[in-house]
Structure formats: structure tokens, C-alpha cells
Amino acid sequence: DEELVTPILNFLLTRDIHMDAFIGGKGYTPIQCVETAQKLTVPSSIKNYIITTRTRLDNILQFIHENQLKVQKMTLNFYPAADGTLIDRETVRKFLVSNPSITTVCGGYNNLEFTRADANKGVGLRKLAEILGVNPDATMAIGDTENDLAIIEAAGIGVAMGNATDAVKARADYVTTTNTKDGVAAAIEHFIL
């Protein structure tokens, strides 16, 4: 809600980072992040996707307030300084994890993501199972980064990709092959077919 996101955004807008707010299934980026997007050290396909799929806003806080919108998720991308350390990442991470109302995870390439503490992929899987009338123990989830931990733990079978982080592999029931070696297909063949 606005009371939760306003102080967080006020802090983030003072940092030298790229950020996206996801609202109603669409991505919005503060106009000042146009420059930081060019500095990101992610594959060009990801950078192009970030740049071309976001609506740029002159004043994101005003946009949220005037339209009474709820931010579903924020993604933050960091770029490296000359010494290779990610500019502002540790400062931002400490700020975010100190807030018990949100959950902060790493979703890949130099990024952090946060949502409300009660909103994660695991909650989503349990809700979907409930809607479909499926026992959560009869579900399988596959992931590779920290933002997949909740769904891997919620699923009846949690599968880590071969290229997953060590934390994901440690919590998974099974480790499949990598994403470049059809790991999802291998897991489906192993458990379902």
C-alpha cells in the first residue's frame, strides 16, 4: 500500500540504481533511471527488455498517490563501480531487510526484489492449488535463484536447476540439469512422465 511504499521509494530515489515498480501487471520506471539502465551489466537481451517494456514516469510517487495504486513488486538493479563492487547494493539491501513488512530476495543479475512480506511465489502456488482443488503436496516447482525459494519449499516436489544458487540447491528435493541442458524438461520427465 501507499503507506508502506512511500518511505521506501523516497529512500530508493536517492540512490544510484535502476528500479522498476510493477503495478497491475505493468512495469514503471522513474525517469531518472533511464540513465542507470544504460550502465547495467546484464546480458544485452535483458537490458533491452528492461528499457523497452517499462513506462517511464516523471514522478512515480505522485503517479501512485493520484491513481491510488498498489505496488505489487519492486525490482532494483545495480551496476558496478570501477572496483567491481555494486554501487549502493549493500546500503539498499540493509535498508530493505530492516523492514519487517517486506520480503527482500535476490532474483539474479545484480538485482534485489521486494514484495509485501505475505506475497511470494510459495503463497501463490498454495493459492493456485486451492483454486484448482489440488493438494499442494501434488505440485512441483522449479527454480534457480533466491526468489524461487518460497515456491520450492511450498511445492510437494521442489526442484533446483543445475545452474541454481547453492542456497536453492540446498533446499530443493531434487537438482535437475541446467537451463541450457533442458533442466525443466528433464525434471518433468523424471517426476511426471
Question: Where in the sequence are the language-model features?
Answer:
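Glycine/small-residue-rich loop that forms an oxyanion/phosphate-binding "nest" at active or ligand-binding sites
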Residues: 1-6
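Conserved acidic, metal-coordinating active-site core of Asp-based
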Residues: 7, 11, 15-17, 22-142
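Mg2+-dependent phosphoryl-transfer enzymes with acidic/Ser/Thr/Gly-rich catalytic loops
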Residues: 97, 112-193
